[in-house]
Amino acid sequence: LMYHAIHVMAPGEEANANLIVDPTTFESHLKALQEAGYYAVSPEEAYKILTENVLPQGKKVVWLTFDDSLWDFYDIAYPLLKQYQMQATNNVITGTVGQEANLSLEEMKEMKEHGISLQGHTVTHPPLATIEASLQQTELADSKTYLDSNLSQDTISFAYPSGSYSEETMAIAEQNNYKMALTTNEGLASAADGLLSLNRVRVLPYMTAEMLLQTIATP
């Protein structure tokens, strides 16, 4: 699942309306997922499932991803995720860490101890398919280095900014030891699509919990 912002939309935010999910709606999603028996996976667990096709304890699984490392993830989404005991992944634009509208390194370190994974979303959020290879290399390498060193981890996944990528981008991702890359292509993730071009279901503001469960139900 792909989320971005979780907050009550303020006046003047209409242009980004499709990226903003109301906290009440978000909580209804978590409650419905929990009641339907979904287990929220970490990137490492997602990778294992996609490569070995083995589900943990035979459960239904969902991967909750949030793009752009926005302030409200810590203030609003994170407490709800903890309340419902759901793991989640935030894809971090490393060049924005510590800015007022974004997560700080301290917040990320705290959340990492409580079931939140911080993965890549480049340094400056450029549409990768439109920039030259050397710049793509810098964006993918530097963001991974930042997360690896500051969070003492091996960053294995990232999301393409604005869903922009090419065959060249995927090759550069592989060279930089990313095991998975997330697109904005609509659909359920499957290894058949390639681990560096995984689909996601975009969560829109008007999606009720019932709609969400229908969208992710597998035959």
Regions found by a protein language model. Name each.
Residues 119-131:
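Substrate-binding clefts and substrate-entry loops adjacent to catalytic sites
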Residues 78-86, 103-120, 174-175, 189-193:
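Acidic (Asp/Glu)-rich catalytic clusters
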Residues 1-64, 71-72, 129-219:
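C-terminal active-site subregion of NodB/CE4 polysaccharide deacetylases
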Residues 64, 93-96, 126-129:
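Surface-exposed cleft-lining segments at the edges of enzyme active sites
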Residues 70-71, 124:
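Short, glycine/acidic-enriched loop or turn micro-motifs at the edges of active sites
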Residues 64-65, 118:
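Residue-level marker for buried hydrophobic side chains located in beta-strands
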